[in-house]
Amino acid sequence: MIRFGIILLILSSFTISQQDGKNIPSPSWKDTSPSMLIGDFKDDYGIAYTLTDSLFTQHPNVKYHIIKWNLKDNYFIAKNDGANPSEQNLYSRIDFMEFSGMEPFRWGFCLTVYDAPTDSIAETKAVADRKDPKKGCGGFPFSRMKRK
């Protein structure tokens, strides 16, 4: 019983020190989300998006709750919102890449996996081909993004 109390005290101290007593998302999200991707965007089809360190929204009503950023391999894993029109509460892998010479489009994304039952399956099920952004998203182009 004493061990349980000590473990609880250590964990509660860690939680308080990690969040400074504020009700905010994990600092690691903000520290690992690339600033180039954060903000309001339109793709080359005119669809509007908003991306924060913890939420990717395809307006008006499709949301992906980001649970993991992988900057080394340029993707993030997200849980599909329960109110999405399809694939509710499943998991997605969204690959991204930076563009050069395609201004005003600075980056693009590929919804590589959108219907995995777990986050680990979404992460390992498929990978986008960034060598050919015009066909590297399962035979389709990456959606090119520009700031609104």
Language-model segments: which ranges?
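Short, solvent-exposed loop/hinge segments that bridge or flank secondary-structure elements
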Residues: I38-L71
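Generic "edge-of-domain/loop-turn" microfeature
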Residues: A48, F56, K63, A83, ...
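Generic structural hydrophobic/aromatic packing signal, biased to beta-strands
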Residues: L51, F56, I94, F109-L111, ...
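Extracellular low-complexity Ser/Thr/Asn/Gly-rich intrinsically disordered segments
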Residues: H59-N61, K72-N74, D119, K125
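Hydrophobic/aromatic beta-strand elements that line small-molecule binding cavities or substrate pockets
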Residues: K63-W69, N80, Y91-S100, C110-V113
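Short beta-strand segments that buttress and anchor functional surface loops
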Residues: F76-N84
